[in-house]
Amino acid sequence: MAELSTRYNPAEIETKWYRYWEEKGYFTPKGVGEKFSIVIPPPNITGRIHMGHALNITLQDIVVRYKRMKGYDVLWVPGEDHAGIATQNAVEKFLLQTQGKTREEIGREKFLEITWEWANKYRREIREQIKALGASVDWTRERFTLDEGLSRAVRKVFVELYRKGLIYRGKYIVNWCPRCKTVLSDEEVEHKEHKSKLYYVKYPVKDSDEYIVVATTRPETMLGDTAVAVHPEDERYKNFVGKTLILPLVGREIPVVADKYVDPKFGTGAVKVTPAHDPNDYLIAQRHNLPMIEIFDDNARINENGGKYKGLDRYEAREKIVKDLEEQGFLVKIEDYTHSVGHCYRCDTVIEPKLSDQWFVSTKPLAKRAIEAVENGEIRFFPERWTKVYLNWMYEIRDWCISRQLWWGHRIPVWYCQDCGHLNVSEEDVEKCEKCGSTNLKQDEDVLDTWFSSALWPFSTLGWPEETEDLKRYYPTDLLVTGFDIIFFWVARMIMMGYEFMNDKPFSHVYIHQLVRDKYGRKMSKSLGNGIDPLEVIDEYGADPMRFTLAILAAQGRDIKLDPRYFDAYKKFANKIWNATRFVLMNLEDYKEVPLENLKTVDKWILTRLNKTVEEVTNALENYDFNIAARTIYNFFWDDFCDWYIEASKPRLKTEERNLVQTVLVKVLDASLRLLHPFMPFLTEELWQKLPVAGESITIAKWPEIERELIDETAEKEFTRLMNMVRGVRNVRAEMNLPQSQRVKVYIKGYEVTEEEELLLKTLGNIEEVSFVNEKPPKTATAYVEEEIEAYVDLGGLIDFEKEKERLKQIMEKIQKEIDRLEKKLANKDFVEKAPEEVVEETKEKLNTNRERLARLESILRDLE
């Protein structure tokens, strides 16, 4: 039979098999049969993939390989995202480091040339990284959000939405990043708690000794104030409404207006209104027809409207203005104040609300069908709780600002006529104005938000706007696997665009995967230095152990706490699979498959367990319960197959039953490797190819089917009893400090074991002799009790009974103290309510384990009395 080296070496087999699969074209669909399609969430071209990508790709590949083995015509489309703001930032840093120049110094054309070189380099690297993970994507269909086909799709969508009145240009308050010098959508702003100050400032009433005290966290913005607002029902200020105030330091006259937006409980109940630099103030200004004065430039420095403060950074201006307010008697007091402040999701700079001309998508008309699809179950979220998160956001959806002040990205397809002012919006480049015929045109300088092109990903990657065969066959896709952090950025927008342009959902199921945290539960970040590089893990442990680790930890609705020790544990599992296969292969010299007749209880038991495992793993994968599927096959292979069946088979391989045992070993190993294949593709291919039943590739082998005729509940019950007897004997040895190699005599009461069972007991339990008794003999310890059946281990001549009794009492005392401690902990309401769920569960498990051990020792002690 085929030989297998003594050591499992992942590096040796991984490159070999991936190349083989690609050459054979296994990842390219054939276009016949029931289809299953999925698009990869495209990684950004800003560097190496991280552990979140590794989890995302692993989970997708598990489903894809499973579906392929189930006979589906599978298409998994790979690709990368141009990642506008992130890539531009990275290239700008690279330029400064390597050439000491800014993008403005080299100009748009040269900057884009360098960025394309960057993009191509990182796309190649990402491709190799995805291959290293074992992802069975169809590389012949790889796409990029800036490639020609997708660019055509982006332009078509922009133009069509514009013509329907769903894209418009307007002056609105936007989130401005002074570092990236671009607008950000609401979803690109990360809110963090800031310890700040609340400044109380007097605003004098014109021609009066009266004044209103206003509380603000941003005194620097008062340079742009155009009113003070109070609540219409606030009795304190009823006589002030309609009066004119003099703006401190500036001298501008501003009105007092009544508006229901104002919270009378905040500060003094009177708020300054700065319409050009606060979204809520902007709405107040619209309701009261107030002017809007911009005071910041694009760098968040005070502009010419700020008088003597012109040129100061916003924080410098705050310091100077507070000092001047104090000196001139306007500052009443300063209080400590904690509040939420928006930051740029890319560079962490505090964003500046800014009045700006931008392009927007009117989302409410698009959201209607996207809401209905999830409400009526046409699109399902896994775990189900994300449905509510999605719907709550969609019900309150705001218009989407899609223009970005960047160079890298899809340039907005709008040309402004410099002669007549007409906006030419077109899918093709415009040479002359459609209104006046002038050739004096200027294209909009801005690019589209990265998420605009990503929103078209499920259909643009399949060839839209062309009516391709791929589009007809593989749209809508079946599954999207993604993180919760981009439900609004990406998932919701894909659903809206899918219904608008394809008149159909983009996918049926959305699986929201876990966040990968470090072993302490902290988010992985550069600042903490706690990230784990998946490629380094692959180098050290192999892709398969890493994939299996991520899968077995991927419980729905619970973040992953990733301890690097897990990789070592599942590398040991890979070694176990390797060694078990090696054992089977070494015992197949004269292999001859025989009918499954004259099976012994142990054979019926393993075949029953196998078929139940097939059913459990299949059901788990159908419901995206990756951890349950992985844990089930792990337990079956390690415990049932290796620890019990292989051990039980060793003496039988030397008897006339050899061919039958070989047949069962091969059958179980073959099915196990196929069940494991979606999780550990490289290892399973290497091992499966050595089996006498192997075909061309495990990648295209059939998924194991449940053979119900091989399920024997009686045999399972009988062998389970036998296993529990053996475990009981092992436990007695362990508690009595006897080596597991110590052969012992066992007495059984209330049950006559068969010849086969006696042989198994002796083999598996290292038992010298099995005798049958009517009552418990002296100097024995109870190993097993089930209804009328009991088993005892003969300890005569093996231990000093008095010493053992003392030792056991001491151990029991320690265990009781631990039980008391754990019970006290669990009785503490604060601990149960405030500690993480997994910590509480772990404490309960420890308590149960200690109680069980104490009961076991009490039983043994009674036996020794």
From Swiss-Prot:
It is an enzyme of class 6 (ligase). A motif ('KMSKS' region) lies at residues 523-527. The keyword Membrane does not apply. Residues 797-865 form a coiled coil. SUPFAM superfamilies: Anticodon-binding domain of a subclass of class I aminoacyl-tRNA synthetases, Nucleotidylyl transferase, tRNA-binding arm, ValRS/IleRS/LeuRS editing domain. Signal peptide: none annotated. It comes from the Bacteria. Belongs to the class-I aminoacyl-tRNA synthetase family. ValS type 1 subfamily. Monomer. This is Valine--tRNA ligase. The lineage of its organism: Bacteria, Thermotogati, Thermotogota, Thermotogae, Thermotogales. The gene is valS.
